[in-house]
């Protein structure tokens, strides 16, 4: 592999990792806010879809330039195409993380059954965060067996988030049936948690 090409690949990987770190940081702040029951601190999540999209476009341009200049072979071509997909997914995840923080903060109130909500929201967020961290760590992995193990770990965590969301959805629907006056607030909480489940 040509040295300039290898350098370009490392730069692209580094930029993608930085987007991932920004999204992970936002999710960690959200987790800390929920664990400490300081929901107002969710407003401190400073990740924006616009900034992520700009960064993603820069990475996409780097990838396209690399494709044009170096005409990579099949394996390297697949790697570059996967980088395009990864940046797109990280932007989507970052957007969902920001939407979660914004919607959860807006709809969370002491009128709701906060202990039940947090009982499921915290593990849901923790599982989504672990899945994202593991996914990002795969970028630097070169051992095929370790990649496979991490991939399976991601699948397990995503399955956990699905299960936790279904459990909280069922419990919130029960709460709504008992207290129709708060149905909008509960649905808003559910909507915010749905964003988290999609991270």
Annotate each language-model stretch with its function.
Residues 1-199:
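Cytosolic, long alpha-helical scaffolding segments
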């Amino acid at each position: 592999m040509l040295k300039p090409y290898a350098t370009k690949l490392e730069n692209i990987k580094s930029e993608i990792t930085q987007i991932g770190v920004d999204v992970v940081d936002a999710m960690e702040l959200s987790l800390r806010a929920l664990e400490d029951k300081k929901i107002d601190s969710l407003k401190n999540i400073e990740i924006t879809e616009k900034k992520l999209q700009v960064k993603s476009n820069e990475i996409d341009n780097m990838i396209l330039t690399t494709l044009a200049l170096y005409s990579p072979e099949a394996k390297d071509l697949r790697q570059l195409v996967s980088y395009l997909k990864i940046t797109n997914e990280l932007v989507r995840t970052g957007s969902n993380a920001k939407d979660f923080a914004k919607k959860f903060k807006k709809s969370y109130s002491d009128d709701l059954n906060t202990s039940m909500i947090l009982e499921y929201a915290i593990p849901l967020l923790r599982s989504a965060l672990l899945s994202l961290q593991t996914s990002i760590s795969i970028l630097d992995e070169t051992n095929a067996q370790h990649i496979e193990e991490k991939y399976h770990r991601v699948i397990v965590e995503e399955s956990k988030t699905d299960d936790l969301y279904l459990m909280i959805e069922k419990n919130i629907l029960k709460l709504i049936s008992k207290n129709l006056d708060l149905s909008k607030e509960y649905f808003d909480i559910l909507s915010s948690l749905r964003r988290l489940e999609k991270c």
